[in-house]
Each structure stands twice: as C-alpha cells, then as structure tokens.
Amino acid sequence: MANKREFSLEKTRNIGIMAHIDAGKTTTTERILYYTGKIHKIGETHEGDSQMDWMEEEKERGITITSAATTAQWKDHRINIIDTPGHVDFTIEVERSLRVLDGAVTVLDAQSGVEPQTENVWRQAENYGVPRIVFVNKMDKIGANFDFSVKSLHERLNANAIAVQMPIGAEDQFEGVIDLFDMVADVYDEDKLGAKWETIPVPDEYKEEAESRREEMIEEIAEVDDDIMEKFLGGEEISNEELKAALRRATLDLKAFPVFAGSAFKNKGVQMMLDGVVDYLPSPLDVKPYIAHDKEGNEVELLADDNKPFAALAFKIATDPFVGRLTFIRVYTGSLESGSYVLNASKNQRERVGRLLQMHANSRTEIPEVFSGDIAGAIGLKDTTTGDSLTDPAHPLILESLDIPAPVIQVSVEPKSKADRDKMDVALQKLTEEDPTFRAETNPETGETLISGMGELHLDIMVERMKREFNVEATIGEPQVAYRETFTVPTQAQGKFVRQSGGKGQYGDVWIEFTPNEGKGYEFEDAIVGGVVPREYIPSVDAGLQEAMKNGVLAGYPLIDVKAKLYDGSYHEVDSSEAAFKVAASLALKNAASKAGAVILEPIMKVQVIAPEEYLGDVMGSITARRGQMEGMEDRAGAKVINAMVPLSEMFGYATTLRSSTQGRGTFTMVMDHYSPCPKSIQAEIIKKRGGNA
C-alpha cells in the first residue's frame, strides 16, 4: 500500500501562511505557487485575479476569507499550503487550519512588524504547538525596517526570533538578501519576475555587518542548543550543517523562530523562505503523535503510518461550484482509497467517499488514494460537518473536535419575494454547514430570520454570498447585539399545568430549584425521591426547560449559565403526559424569573486601538464615552497602543469615528472576551425595545 506514495512522509510539509490583514499573505502564497511551477501567470491581489482568493467576495475586497488549500512542490518535497484569513472576523478559519497543520509561516509587514491580529494568530499557533518561521515581507515599502520587525517579535510576542538573513538595502533600494549561513548574497533580476537571481559573494560594503550578524546568529543558536554552546565556548569550528540541524531542533521544540526577509510583490526572497520551510518546519513524522480516544475513552496515539487503520479529521466544508459539497480532510494515520466507506465516529454513521481530490486554490486533480499526512478534498460525505472524526469502520476513534466561538452580532434578513424565501432557506443551510460560527434561526414571535456571526464584515460577506452564489435578494436589518440573560439569585419555583376539558385532561406539576452557574452553561439535576414525578417524565422536564430558556424571561434572549434541580412535584395517573410536564417546567421557569434576579448580559470586546500620540486624548475620551474600561497602554513605533474592554453595543460605527478623529491614521481590532451584566438603565431600554417584562 505504502509504495504508491509520490512523496515520502519525511518530504511532506503541511504548512499554513498566517498574518495580520494586508501583511501580504495571499501574495506570498501566489509567489510560492509561481516558483514551484503551479501557475504560469502571477496573480495580484490588488488586481483581483489572485489564484488563492477564489471567491468573488475575496476578489472584490482583496482579502482572504476561506482558507484555500493547495499543493506545491519544492526541492523534491511536497508542500501542502493553507492560506488563512488575517481578519479577526474569520478567526474560526485560522483555528481550523492550525488544527491540521504541522508548521506555519508567519508573514509580517516590514513597516508595521507585529500587529494585533498577528498576536491573535500567534497565540492560537502557540495553543496548538505549531512550529513557525517568519517572513518579513514588503521590504520594498517606504518605512520598511527589518530590525524593527525582528525586535517586535521579541517584545510583543516574547518570541525567540533568530534572523538567518539580512536584507540588502530597504524600501526602493531593496535588492536581495544575504544568507548568514553560507555568507553569500542572493541578488534578484527585476525583469525575470524573481524566478532568476544571482548568488554572489557578499558585497564589500555589507561584509562587516554581515559578519557581526552571523556571529550574533550563532550565539543565539548556541543559547538554545547545548552541543553548539559547548563548541562555541570552546572556540571550535561549527559547520553550517550542525548549525542548521540545531536550529531545526529548536524550531520544532518552539524554542526558536527563524526569520527571513523579502518582498513577495517584488518577487524577492520567497525561494529562500521556501528553503526555510523545507529546512526548519516539521514533516508529519516530526510532530508529536496526535491523541485520539477509542469507544471506551482510552487515549490512542495516531502515528503517521500508512499501514495503520485510517483516521482523519474533517476540518472544513465548502460548496464548490463544480463538484458540490466538498469536505477538506487531514489524514493523521492510515490510507484511504476513493470509493471506500468510512465511519463518521462523531455521528456514528457510515459514509462513502466518492472521489478524492487534491486541491489547488479552486482547481483540482482527482487522486486514487490519500495517505497519512495528506490534506485532500473528499466528495460524497453528506452528513459530515466541521470537526467530525472519520475513521476505519472497524476501529472507531474520536479525534478532539474544534473549539467553536459563539457568534456576537446579529442582523435580520428579509427575503424580497416568496421565491427568494425558498432559495434563502437552502442558502442558509449550506452556509451554516460551511461555517460553524455563522448561525441562522427564526424568531418564533416575529417570524423573522436572524443571522448571527463574528462581526459586521463576517455578516456582510455571508449576505453577499447568498446574493451571488444562491441568487437571493434580501433586505438586511440593522446589526443587533447577541445579548444573553441569566439568573443571579438562587430561587425555587413551582410550575403546575392542569387542564380539564372533557375526556382526558392534562396534568403536570414540578418544583425546581434554580441557581446561578456562571461560565458553566445549563445543567439539569434530577433529585426526585420516591417517584413523585415518574421516571419517564423527567427528560420532558429537562427538555421543557431547555426550550423555554431559548427565549429568556426578560427580553426574549437566550438564558444561560443556570443550574436547574428538579426536587419535587406530583402527577395524575390518567391525565399526566410528557407534553404536560414540558409545559409545567416552562411555567416553573417563568415563575422563578421575578425572584431570581434575572439580568441581561452583554458581550464585552477586547479592543486595541493604535493611533499617533497627538490623538491620544481624543481616542481615550471616545473609549470612555463608549463605557470602555482602560486596560493599559504601550508605545509602538511612534504610535500609542491602547488596550480596553468595551461593550459590543457601543462599538457600532466606531471605525468611522476613529478615522475622522485621527485623520485616518488610527486603526483598531476587537475580539470577543466575555459576557457581563448590563447597567440597569441600559437593561431597561433593551427590555422596553423588545417589549419584554421588566
């Protein structure tokens, strides 16, 4: 079986390209594909014809929304690349891809260094233990500064960044890079789109600086490797092979992060960074074995071995215009032929894999089989969703699923006609399958459809896709905050439902104790003694509560973080039924509301604003006016960085305010941090607006 492999596991790299929005990730990926012979014409993001950004919305906005997976070949290695979005609204895409990668290239903008979303993706990569190399891009840009970028890695990410190159010049004088191992200069031929370069001895004017930087690099490698340190202190000669091997070990152990320089747009430095992917990033054999669990809950190590039973993770669902529903999978162990059956262990369902595809942005090649360490697209998996485990039917295993954040912002969508309504239902079903942070639901009172997501841009793009891919014309309401409700005071309440209307009546009676359960969600406890509520009705009490909690008690927002203990009640031999106990449970919740100190919770965002110092007063004033709590401040490259916690409801329209108060020089990012009770006055306003019960 293993002899059908085109590339050995040692020569396979699964990497992600990650960065802040606009640092040049997609352009970098484009260049990789160009140099590895995958495309014949280079696409430019700012011209809207980039190969990786294949959805219309991405081409228009010049940002990457979905992580396109593609395969390239470099120096007899296969490199599977996932291009991830840099915009914070698409964090789930980054999380998903990090779960299935073995290594990553972090792209920095040479002028800005580490930016807010760089910090987010870096932290996510730390969580998953993903080794990284860094590509300082845009060295040709005005204000480009390689040393500042390396320093920002140390200071802002506490990362042991080791520069393995130095740039020759910067801004419009940027000509190429000096390799500090071989002490040669790679100078590019502008006319040949960077596919041609000349390796020359280090120019005289750079010799001294290059020597001192090489010394510094050796010292930094010695600090993370005892063998090198011993030779270094003993004044022995250390070969480049030994240095590179030591740096590879340190990179795999997350003790060091090699740094490269270049300009993807100007086609300089990308090939050396590709060498870095091969030299320093792990093959599937170098990473710690992935841990799965068998039916009994025992841990099982998944070794990258084609002869072991098959196990893979479905990490993304996409609707492809040519092949329909496409499931992206990462194979951890074993192999799988197209046409065979797999067990979706998460749902305990057998599914047939019709065809297997190797993806290249949005074109594809059909392949007969996938092996451990591969990333591929599968067609035919109808019930598989993001995060599901696919395994050999004889060896069911559950791989750890993805941690999916709850959406924080909501808008209503009203189809313009009856035909649009039908198309919209299909569209929403497909889009929610593809993106687990996007939800669609119907408000039972008003009948309107509400969609929720991670931010305004996220929802804009989804509405845009409904229009373009599914032809749905719809009117969009104002963005609404996804509030929640909770109880703050323990209380007990009875719910009794009795209805007698000739013949068989209805009877259900329960006493429930409700207690706050902060941060732990909903819990149900059955404390019935002596059968006062018969066994068969207890699940109905639980179900009745969960249903009632969907529409809260104050303003119809979902009720969260409550523990319900059913401790007493009564029943009627003839009239009691599951339905009656369901209603009784919802009445108990309603009756508890007035005594349980119900409050409305609002999402609080972690906001980071970066603005020149002269606007500091205005920026801080504006944050305070938005009920923001300052968390601290730092200096960064001639600007002030302000960290604050601000309620989401106060952040609508902030981008415009910030632009005008800083003359377009301020930027901000925000991520959901936690839920917190609303001030009384705001709670009263929300209840009034929703026609709830104060």
From Swiss-Prot:
Catalyzes the GTP-dependent ribosomal translocation step during translation elongation. During this step, the ribosome changes from the pre-translocational (PRE) to the post-translocational (POST) state as the newly formed A-site-bound peptidyl-tRNA and P-site-bound deacylated tRNA move to the P and E sites, respectively. Catalyzes the coordinated movement of the two tRNA molecules, the mRNA and conformational changes in the ribosome. GTP binds at residues 19-26, 83-87, 137-140. Residues 10-285 form the tr-type G domain. It is found in: Cytoplasm. PROSITE patterns: G_TR_1, G_TR_2. Disulfide bonds: none annotated. Belongs to the TRAFAC class translation factor GTPase superfamily. Classic translation factor GTPase family. EF-G/EF-2 subfamily. GO terms for biological process: ribosome disassembly. It comes from Lactobacillus delbrueckii subsp. bulgaricus (strain ATCC BAA-365 / Lb-18). Keywords: Cytoplasm, Elongation factor, GTP-binding, Nucleotide-binding, Protein biosynthesis. Pfam families: EFG_C (PF00679), EFG_III (PF14492), EFG_IV (PF03764), GTP_EFTU (PF00009), GTP_EFTU_D2 (PF03144). SUPFAM superfamilies: EF-G C-terminal domain-like, P-loop containing nucleoside triphosphate hydrolases, Ribosomal protein S5 domain 2-like, Translation proteins. One of its GO terms (molecular function) is GTPase activity. One of its GO terms (cellular component) is cytoplasm. This is Elongation factor G.
